[in-house]
């Protein structure tokens, strides 16, 4: 297997394949990220990671390994091996001739011919192509637009300011070619025909006319090819600049703007809208060159044939308004299609992000139907645009012929006799006009319309509301609302506080009459620890967001004196090493790092991770448990040196003992002397804070220390323990994680820790697969099969052949007509009018047939393409949703999304156009060859030679370009992954001032992509240039051959030369399009690759194995010798090990254990989400024998990470309209959300933002609880379902569950012991085994192992006594 490279810098991952591994650079060791080295070069590391070779190959450290990883950067750097730096781009050192002739591409062609290219074979991007430089220039230009008060900002003006001369200069070259060289060609053609027709005036100059023809063709090639490349190059740079600008803007969006702008929309801007820049700037010059050319050529033709010239030109001009209308329609259609594409991508993005929850709800099929419906609507809109393209393709072929027909018929009707010179001069001139007026000008109109539509979408995004620049430095910072300046008297008081808030009012929705925070007055002293508590949805997180500056104040005053660090309520990790996630761009301080790791209770996890803190954690921390993610996020915040730490409920995701450790050792220990604002629901810690803030409905309900609030009774109202118990919590003993009770073995990575992203235990990351070799015929067959099958293909092919027969027949008939007229004139005979009329009728019939057949063939092909796109998309979406969870752990979110965005965009829009081009050009070339062979069969010799040369050149080109296209596609995926990850962690990124670090990483990914894309367009243009040169040689042979083998008359010369001249554009374009077809088919290849995904199992069992509709009636659950692993590798270590236990019907079972003990894996086994041995029986039925939906529909789940979808509240509760509004309101009332939803503008129809960001995490968990109540299943699973809600709401919810699910079996995973202390039984798990299982009271008093006893005891003496009392009462009442 070839080594797969990884380009540095790599924020997203460190990729490896087999023996190839990536070692962090010294900058990575010091900063947590790979930054650019001084020459900004991309590099590939080939050294092993910082463990011994044996340990690396095994994927874990051996017992005897003495080379254990440390966080000491000096020790690490001592093991570094020399990097392999990517070489300088040969274009950077090429001279003028080399650049003009594309000689600098020879090394990559040579390498591509010998081997399969990958990222290691690329070069560093040119200085002018670097993303950061281009982004800086365009951002500066856009800022000038924003500061111009006199007019609306224009992205077009901003682009022209930066790239204007590079876009304008090619217009001069196009002007010279079109109005100079191409206009001269017909003149010399006429002279050459005159020579072979025996005209006396041309007798001595025929050879010179032939040479002039050849020279003009050569000059056209030498000017246009570099010009085309130059425009592609500048378009590519514009795209990079806009991508960088969009990413920077995304990092500045306010929460409100982010709610209105979905991540799918931002991804679509970069994947679909920006690439439309690639073609419009080239054709736009024809909007002014084309009209000038029409005037000049019309004048020249008028000089020769008089008013007849106007007939054809007017016909061509009459199509211009139609083209303008179609351009407008195309713009409107594209905008509508883009909106529908945004909607589809948003849905796909949400589904992929929440796939596990979707599977547990058994919602795959209904959501698949929704995406299918969205896809149909999207493709119906795209089809309208394709039909316009089909009309345009047909028009291109027949327009010049109709124009020629009108001019010649007019010329004949006027009583004049046309000669070969007249006929082929008109033909040549109209062919020139065809290129300009029928191809380039209409294309310019359509592409400019599409370009402007995309520009408007980017402009709209760039004008979205953004946060003001806030300087979170060591000095004081203010957020003072205009109109409410602080008085001089208050200034000194403000500076005495770490955080000072005066009369603050703020709201997320500017249109809402209600404030999220209202009348907030708060002074936080430097060095104090402040706890913020309150009911779910009371505004705790919003207060933190206001301090961060994320929630803008509507009135009042907020001042922060000092630098901030922040831990979010929902842990945010990116796909990188644990160390990268903790350092997050900060310099490496070994002593501080070790201290933070210890205080955040991560040492044990590091010891057991395959590569310690250099282990890849997976995208969004997918391979870690919730507790591990929370502690790594906390460590990131704590490692950052700041004076103020904002911790948004980091203790809810960990168990009681770890929470005690984090509070004692981290909050009160390591952060002693710093200001800490801690949002928490853990009341046992309240006696040990300096100040408590109680929030209710966005207002401060009470403020003070523990003793004063205890006397008011406000604290007691929040908890489940008695007032006496809480008073005794001051006697709690500090937690010692090194005590014997805490040295039980723990699994390092959560339930899917058995493999990291790479699917093994090595801690390495999965590398996206790159195909090799050519595109197989089977792939084409699969594509056309998806488009309607063999019959549809044959009908379309037959129609295309008939269309070309009609077109070639028209050309041949014209030659026949010219010969007939000239022969009659040569004999002094006049052809009768009846005969002339018959010729006119015949020619008219041929033209009409050409129009009909070309339209038919184009529409048929586009219809096939539309069907293929829909079926391919729906097929792979079905495969993805049916894939097992292992697939999602080894494939990045961005990589999967890439298939549904850029790859499907290629299949939808690019591939049909290329297919039409290839088919029509192939048939056109066949027609030309037939015509040439009919005139002089000997000309088939150079034609055959040309074909052989082109065939070998094409193969040489394809081997290189196909690999470059694949590498380009693979290098594109990290751009989307990085963008999506950054949008998810926006608050954390901004709070830690990491925007610049993230921007550099995004720029590095764009540079890696640019490296591949630039070489792709370079090799493409080099190939085109080479073919053009060969075409010039071919035309030279054809033209000069007439002097060696004189034809019978000038008409044959005119026919052959006009046909051969078309080859200079047609052949090179055709061969390039066949190559482009193969390259575009790589998108189909990447899409079809997902068709081979193995499904996780049948959804519905056969009738004989399907459980009864009333199943399960009892809710008994039996585990028999169950083993579970997260990889299909049967030899992999099991995460759950030989579990055997029985849960009785209607039993309430609490499941506890340290982070990574296997609690959530138990739930995965119940839902059959992973690979298992042994059996799970529910009411005596083996769940392995039934369909997945038969099983999952009968189990309700409240997941650990609550998931809401963008849409309405009703849609999130009941996406398929199965229940009445009354039923929904009843469920909301039972979970204490009725009042919250009632206060929304539209009640159940109120909008939910993407990811449910306009609701707190606790409220989202309550919505998930409402879903479970709606389903009324016999078995309920709660995985940390109330971890983020306050104790009072938790108590009310527990009461609701006890009432609503009295006759149900309930499994509850919880870190809060009081949540499960009244359960019938408690299951204690550790290292994937059940170590205790019994009633809570018995486990606390009679158990020999005392694991549960010790766990409860660690919560403190007072808490232990209160929990024991509740357990005893439950035991005695059972």
From Swiss-Prot:
Highest taxon in the source lineage: Eukaryota
Mode of membrane association: Multi-pass membrane protein
Record's subcellular location: Membrane
Pfam families associated with the record: ABC_membrane, ABC_tran
Binding annotation for ATP 2: 1153-1160
PROSITE patterns: ABC_TM1F, ABC_TRANSPORTER_1, ABC_TRANSPORTER_2
SMART domains: AAA
Protein name (database record): Probable multidrug resistance-associated protein lethal(2)03659
